[in-house]
Structure formats: C-alpha cells, structure tokens
Amino acid sequence: DTTKEIVKKTTKLDKNFLIYGEPWKGGNSPLMNGTFKGSQRNENFSVFNDTFRDAIRGDNNPSNGFINGNQHSITCNWSIIEGLKGSIYTLTSNQNESINYADAHDNYTLWDQIEKSQNPSLSQGDYRKNISIYPLDNHFVRQDLLALSILFTAQGIPFIQYGSEFLRTKQGNHNSYNSSDEINSIKWSDKNKFIDIFDYTK
C-alpha cells in the first residue's frame, strides 16, 4: 500500500517518475499483503525480473542459463522468449513494469556467474585470469556480451550493474555487503583494459 500511495502522489507531480524495486521480502515480515511477483500488475511501478535473469545466466547456485550452457532447455528458452517480450504474460501488464537485468548489487556479478558456473572450484583471485589481450576472442567474454545483447534488445527497462560494461568481478563473492573495498570498489583501470567490451556495451 505504501508503494501504491507513493506512485499515486508522484505521478500527479510528474508522469515520468520511475519507481521500481524487488518483488520479494528480505525476510520474515508481519505484513500480510506485500507485493509479490505479478501482484504489481497495472500499479504503475516496475520490478526486477529475476525469472528473466535466471533464464539468461542461471540462478545463484550458480547454475547455467541460456548464455552459458542451458540453451537446449525448453523451459529456459521459453523464459528467454517471454522476457524478450517484456514478460507480459507471466509477470507484467506491460513491458515498462519489467526491470531486465543479469546482475545487480547482490549475488554474483555477470562475469563471476559465467566463470563460476563453468568452474565451481574457482578460487578468489583466479577470476578473469585467462583473458588474453584480445578479449573478444574469449568464449566467456562472448557469453557476457550475449547476455548484455539480450538485455538491451528485450522489451522493458534494461538495468546493468556499474562495472558490468567492463567485465566487473568481485572475485566470486556473491554476498559482498560487508566485504572490503578491494572486493566492492570499481576498478576503473578495467575500462581501459576491456575497452572493446565497454564500447560494445555503449
């Protein structure tokens, strides 16, 4: 109800306000009528589409998605098709309610997800070690770019985590809220190192 009231009041001021959030609770709550996936339909706010995220790259176990080995799964393929259409038959009433993403502030970065899903025993410090001076020749880099291409061509609102445009890694830390700056900081030198990926994303 709070979100609905905020939407109602802000759109009176400016119809271009964008209000979005996570359609799930962060834990136990005494509130009985929260907003859950699909219940926001026609309420004029947007939600993170984690079903589309998981179809693209796999869940946070980590598992595989369309880009990294699960492209023959009928369920995965239908979720990709539905996500490309803005999830208007499963999650939203229109595509503007869908925040399309492959990574965000929590869980694995897109790059870490790709590497970890292919090598579960990969250790901290070993991420991005096997990228040559020609990154576009790297199979994992091409998977990363495929994920971004899907996001940017899907109906809905594309969302990327800062640094994803140059293969951001948190060295496999999928829950880094209390980790060091070394893990959480943006390594701006990576923009120059992976300028081809940055330019592709731009």
Spell out what each predicted region is.
Residues K4:
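Substrate-access "cap/lid" subdomains that shape
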Residues V7, N16-Y162, F166-L167, N175-Y177:
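Conserved alpha/beta catalytic core and glycan-binding cleft of carbohydrate-active enzymes
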Residues S164-K202:
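Extended hydrophobic/aromatic segments used for targeting, binding, or gating
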